[in-house]
C-alpha cells in the first residue's frame, strides 16, 4: 500500500523538510504540490520549488507537480522538457493540452489528470493518439469546503473504470494538522472529513479497497501515532493489539498475511501452518459455543493437516470443538479487521 504527503510552499522550507523526513522514515515515496494555489502569494517559486525538488529527490520521493503552461515561468524554465531535468517525474495537467501533446508528454513524464473530469471522449482521443495508459494517472481532488467532497461509492465507481484501463489512481484523506484558509481538512471523500488517529488510517484502507493506488495526506501533517500506522501501511503489516492466552504467546510479533482467496467469515493466516517452531496442541474444548468478533482461533491436532492454522473471527461464529481459542484482538483494534484481506499483512503486538 502506497502513501503520499502534500507539500505547500506557504508552510516554509523547514516545515516541509520536517514532513519529508517523517515521510521518508515511514517509507512514503510520493508527494503532491501545486504551483497554482491562490493563497500562496509572494512565493519565489524559482528558488523554493528547486529547493523542494532537491529535498524530495534526496528522500527518493516522487514529486507530483500541479502545473500549466503559465506556471513554467514561475520555475524559470521555457519548456516542459526542462521539468525532467529538475527532477519532476509526474505532472498534473488540467487544461491547455490536446491529445497529441498529452501523449507526447507522457513519454517523458507520468501525466496526471483530475479523476472526476476524464470523459469517454478524452479516453478515445488519447487512444487514437497512441496513449500508453500505464503512463497516465488519475488524481482526485481534495475538498477544503465542508459538504463538497465525493462519496466513497462515487470514488470507487470512477476508480474502477480508470484502473481497468491501466491508470494509476491517487486520492486524499485529511491530515491532523490542518491547512488554511478554512482549516476543515482536505479529503477526497466527504465522510472522511474530521477523522483522526486509527479512524483516519481506516479511511485510507477504505480508499485502497476502492482501487486507489496511492493515498495522500491532503493537509500538511499528522500526529506521531498516525505516522507509525502509515509506516505499517507501507510495509503491508497492520499491528493489532492482542491478548493471548498462556501457551499461545508464540503468536506475538510474527508477520502473517490473509490468504488471497479471502473468507468473509475469518482472516486465515497463510503462514501459521508452516512455522516449524510453533507448538500444535490437542483440542481443548471451550465452554463457549460461539466465537465473537476478534476471537483468535488455532486449529488443534484433531483438524489433521490443518493443525496449527490460525484464524481470526470477522464476526460472531459457531465455535468448532477442534479449534482452540488462543486469545482476542483488543476492542480498539477490531475496526481494522474488515480491511485485512486478500494478502494484506498483520502482526499481533502486546497491549
Residue ranges of model-derived segments:
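N-terminal small/glycine-rich loop or linker at the start of catalytic domains
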Residues: 1-7, 56, 175-185
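Active-site beta->alpha loop and helix N-cap motifs at the rims of alpha/beta catalytic domains
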Residues: 3-135
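Residues in well-ordered beta-strands of folded domains
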Residues: 6, 139, 313
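Short secondary-structure transition/capping segments
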Residues: 8-9, 24-27, 76-87, 106-119, ...
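Electropositive, surface-exposed helix/loop patches at the edges of structured domains
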Residues: 65-82, 98-103, 132, 150-157, ...
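Catalytic alpha/beta core domains of metabolic enzymes, predominantly
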Residues: 116-246
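C-terminal functional modules
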Residues: 245-351
Amino acid at each position: 500500500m502506497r502513501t503520499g504527503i502534500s507539500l505547500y510552499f506557504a508552510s516554509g522550507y523547514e516545515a516541509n523538510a520536517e514532513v519529508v523526513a517523517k515521510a521518508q522514515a515511514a517509507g512514503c515515496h510520493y508527494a503532491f504540490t501545486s504551483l497554482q494555489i491562490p493563497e500562496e502569494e509572494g512565493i519565489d517559486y524559482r528558488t523554493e520549488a528547486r529547493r523542494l525538488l532537491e529535498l524530495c529527490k534526496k528522500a527518493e520521493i516522487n514529486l507530483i507537480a500541479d502545473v500549466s503552461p503559465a506556471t513554467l515561468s514561475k520555475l524559470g524554465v521555457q519548456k516542459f522538457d526542462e521539468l525532467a531535468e529538475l527532477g519532476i517525474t509526474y505532472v498534473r495537467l488540467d487544461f491547455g493540452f490536446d491529445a497529441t501533446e498529452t501523449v507526447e508528454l507522457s513519454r517523458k513524464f507520468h501525466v496526471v489528470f483530475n479523476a472526476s473530469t476524464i470523459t469517454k471522449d478524452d479516453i478515445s482521443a488519447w487512444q487514437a493518439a497512441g496513449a500508453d495508459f500505464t503512463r497516465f494517472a488519475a488524481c482526485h481532488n481534495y475538498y477544503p469546503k465542508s459538504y463538497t467532497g465525493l462519496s466513497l461509492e462515487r470514488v470507487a465507481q470512477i476508480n474502477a473504470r480508470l484502473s481497468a484501463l491501466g491508470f494509476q489512481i491517487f486520492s486524499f484523506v485529511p491530515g491532523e494538522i490542518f491547512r488554511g484558509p478554512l482549516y476543515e481538512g482536505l479529503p477526497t471523500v466527504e465522510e472522511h472529513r474530521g477523522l483522526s488517529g486509527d479512524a483516519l488510517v481506516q479511511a485510507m484502507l477504505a480508499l485502497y479497497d476502492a482501487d486507489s493506488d496511492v493515498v495522500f495526506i491532503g493537509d500538511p501533517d499528522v500526529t506521531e501515532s498516525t505516522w507509525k500506522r502509515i509506516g505499517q501501511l507501507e510495509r503491508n503489516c497492520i499491528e493489532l493489539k492482542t491478548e493471548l492466552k498462556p501457551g499461545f504467546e508464540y503468536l506475538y510479533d510474527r508477520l502473517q498475511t490473509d490468504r488471497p482467496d479471502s473468507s468473509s467469515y475469518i482472516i486465515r493466516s497463510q503462514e501459521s501452518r508452516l512455522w516449524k517452531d510453533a507448538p500444535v496442541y490437542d483440542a481443548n474444548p471451550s465452554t463457549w459455543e460461539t466465537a465473537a468478533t476478534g476471537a483468535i482461533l488455532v486449529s488443534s491436532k484433531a483438524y489433521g493437516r490443518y493443525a496449527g492454522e490460525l484464524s481470526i473471527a470477522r464476526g460472531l461464529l459457531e465455535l468448532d470443538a477442534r479449534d482452540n481459542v488462543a486469545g482476542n484482538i483488543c476492542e480498539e483494534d477490531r475496526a481494522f479487521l474488515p480491511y485485512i484481506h486478500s494478502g494484506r499483512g498483520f502482526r499481533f503486538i502486546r497491549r
